[in-house]
Amino acid sequence: MNRVATILLNRNLPDVTERLYEHLARFDGDLTDIFVVEAGSDVELLSRYTTWHANSDEVVRRGLRYGRGMNYGLSQLVKEGKFGEYDAFFLLTNDTEFNEGPTLAPLLKVLDDHGRVGILAPCSERWGERLLLHREPTKYFWFIHNNAYLLRRAFVEAVCDMEEPDVMGFLFDGTNFRGYGAEHELIAKAYANDWAAAITSQVWARENESHLLEKADQIKTEGYEDNLKIYVAEGRRWMRKKYGFNSHWSMQQYVKCFYDRFFEYYPEFSQYKV
């Protein structure tokens, strides 16, 4: 049995999804099983590697986005009795790109070396965080904006809703549809439950935004600028309603409190603090 379940999220971009699938199968096929979630894709635009096709009227109209999509995939693994077979889950949007070579082997090495890391993200060459990873290639952070997370199963089990695994609340809060601030909430849950969130430069990843810029109509979403405005506006309303926070800064400070407390309990990891 492979150690990792990789979940790829696709909406009407089969060629893009298949390239990523084949990259992972080529370089990491001995470590991962790959599952493709179709987020309301048109039948003629399904990937040939499709595992599950979410095709309710609402999903066909709006898609799933990252949070609901990953909830869907993880919930399916639970319902099919496969969830407990894996050590970790690699959650990817199909516009994620990696360098030629293995991705999961070095990430799993980091996860094995850092026993309290529950969330691990490869670094991006566009991130300022890369400047903090010269001497120590892996550091623990209180903010990681990414569409490529490797999650330890023990962490997921500590914070997920195993009693009612579904698209709206298994791991991510599905009421935050586009996901602005969702990474804050997930990382806060990690540190509040004695798990760390880390970025590593052992693997590099990037998001190919050209698909949203050039194929918004095919994906059936708003154009890049409109999508960004709605993403922020919806997320700020969600933060206000759920937490009473009026700004992104307040949410960050909320997470930072749990982050600092983690190192009070685990001073042996202080070398990984930023």
Question: Where are each of the predicted segments found?
Answer:
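N-proximal low-complexity "stem/linker" segments adjacent to membrane-targeting elements
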Residues: M1-E22
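Short, acidic, metal-binding catalytic loop of nucleotide-sugar glycosyltransferases
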Residues: E22-T32
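A conserved acidic beta->alpha catalytic loop
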Residues: D30, V36-L46, E97
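Active-site-proximal specificity loops/subdomain of glycosyltransferases
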Residues: E44-Y86
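Short beta-strand-to-loop acidic/aromatic patch adjacent to the donor-nucleotide binding site
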Residues: G84-E97
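Conserved catalytic core of nucleotide-sugar-dependent glycosyltransferases
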Residues: N99-M168
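Aromatic-glycine-rich donor-binding/catalytic loop that engages nucleotide-sugar donors
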Residues: L151-Y180, K189-W195
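C-terminal catalytic/acceptor-binding lobe
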Residues: T175-V274
